[in-house]
């Protein structure tokens, strides 16, 4: 028997991480097992009294919304990212639509959206989305997506198709987009978006620059700022927006410094919310920020010149986005 055969026969069975199937959607431990940064477990903190999730009421539209989404083959980030506010939002007949599939090309360890090799774009999705929005009679919608690093334009044209077809069927509906970073294809993506810009342009900074390597592998802090500033330069009448999580190990001063950077890059609207780990296989919560600190962030935001700041433990980027835009005078 050859040495090669001896080595082969004595190998241990492959672990799940080694049996990697790029076409399968990976979540939780399967997703985070392959990122270059090891997740270091921390003592699980007890949730404080101010962390409260509103459940859907008995007479809500929760199941109606779910049925309509499934009938139209649509995905929401509310479901895919395990958002704690899903009961309240679906119950009120609102949802944040997630386009371009349910498999992201990134593996951010704070996020519960699945990772894998994305499927080809669904050419029928913009039409399905537009008809669903019209059926639900929505006055304000948020459209987001997975990262699509496999596409030459990062998915920008698909965004434009969704925006334009929605406006055809629902001309009075305001459209906010929460876009990926289009890293490596920024100019091309912005050129495409300029043909049919949204009513609000949102891209989340997510965390402070010191934690980017750990929390946002594949992303770049300066690039994300540039995306929003360059979009604003090209579309000065369209408000820009960004969001941050707290509880990943940042300091209050680091959050304030990011807010200053946002204003220096012409970002108009701000959201800040408490990070809640989707599972034990995601980045751990290292602190629960007190409501008094959230209030301080909000006060400082208005001093810095943000037109609107939604700041609080359960705030998410698209949570009550219609109210945020209205209070800022944009909707």
Curated annotation (Swiss-Prot):
GO cellular component: cytoplasm
Biased composition, class Basic and acidic residues, residue ranges: 21-33
Annotated localization: Cytoplasm
GO molecular function, one term: metal ion binding
Biased composition (Low complexity): 7-19
Highest taxon in the source lineage: Bacteria
Reactions catalysed: [[Fe-S] cluster scaffold protein carrying a second [4Fe-4S](2+) cluster] + N(6)-octanoyl-L-lysyl-[protein] + 2 oxidized [2Fe-2S]-[ferredoxin] + 2 S-adenosyl-L-methionine + 4 H(+) = [[Fe-S] cluster scaffold protein] + N(6)-[(R)-dihydrolipoyl]-L-lysyl-[protein] + 4 Fe(3+) + 2 hydrogen sulfide + 2 5'-deoxyadenosine + 2 L-methionine + 2 reduced [2Fe-2S]-[ferredoxin]
Residues bound to [4Fe-4S] cluster 1: 78, 83, 89, 318
Any Pfam family the entry gives: LIAS_N
Cofactor binding mode and count: Binds 2 [4Fe-4S] clusters per subunit. One cluster is coordinated with 3 cysteines and an exchangeable S-adenosyl-L-methionine.
Main localization (coarse): cytoplasm
Residues engaged in binding [4Fe-4S] cluster 2: 104, 108, 111
EC id: 2.8.1.8
Every Radical SAM core domain range: 89-307
Region ranges (Disordered): 1-33
Stored InterPro entries: Aldolase_TIM, Elp3/MiaA/NifB-like_rSAM, LIAS_N, Lipoyl_synth, rSAM
Transmembrane segments: none
Keywords, sorted A to Z: 4Fe-4S, Cytoplasm, Iron, Iron-sulfur, Metal-binding, S-adenosyl-L-methionine, Transferase
Family to which this protein belongs: Belongs to the radical SAM superfamily. Lipoyl synthase family.
Name of the protein in question: Lipoyl synthase
Organism listed in the record: Cupriavidus pinatubonensis (strain JMP 134 / LMG 1197)
């Amino acid at each position: 028997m050859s040495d090669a055969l001896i080595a082969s026969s004595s190998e241990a069975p492959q672990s799940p991480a080694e049996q990697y199937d790029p076409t399968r959607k990976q979540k939780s431990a399967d997703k985070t097992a392959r990122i270059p940064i090891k997740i270091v477990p921390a003592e699980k903190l007890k949730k404080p009294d101010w962390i409260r999730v509103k459940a859907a009421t008995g007479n809500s539209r929760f199941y109606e919304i779910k049925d309509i989404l499934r009938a139209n083959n649509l995905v929401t980030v509310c479901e895919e990212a395990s958002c704690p506010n899903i009961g309240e939002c679906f119950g009120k007949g609102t949802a944040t639509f997630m386009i371009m599939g349910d498999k992201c090309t990134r593996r951010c360890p704070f996020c519960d959206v699945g990772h894998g090799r994305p499927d080809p774009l669904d050419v029928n999705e913009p039409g399905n989305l537009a008809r669903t929005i019209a059926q639900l009679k929505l006055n304000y919608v948020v459209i987001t997506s997975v990262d699509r690093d496999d596409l030459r334009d990062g998915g920008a044209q698909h965004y434009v198709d969704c925006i334009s077809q929605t406006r055809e069927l629902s001309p009075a509906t305001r459209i906010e987009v929460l876009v990926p970073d289009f890293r490596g294809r920024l100019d091309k993506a912005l050129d495409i978006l300029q043909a049919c810009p949204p009513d609000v342009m949102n891209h989340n900074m997510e965390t402070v620059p010191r934690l980017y390597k750990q929390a946002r592998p594949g992303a770049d802090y300066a690039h994300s700022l540039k995306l929003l500033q360059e979009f604003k330069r090209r579309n000065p009448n369209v408000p820009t927006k960004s969001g941050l999580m707290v509880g990943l190990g940042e300091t209050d001063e680091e959050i304030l410094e990011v807010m200053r950077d946002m204003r220096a890059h012409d970002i108009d609207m701000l959201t800040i919310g408490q990070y809640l780990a989707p599972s034990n296989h995601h980045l751990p919560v290292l602190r629960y920020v007190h409501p008094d600190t959230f209030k301080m962030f909000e006060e400082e935001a208005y001093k810095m010149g943000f037109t609107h700041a939604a700041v609080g433990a359960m705030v998410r980027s698209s949570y009550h986005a219609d109210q945020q835009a209205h209070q800022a005078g944009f909707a």
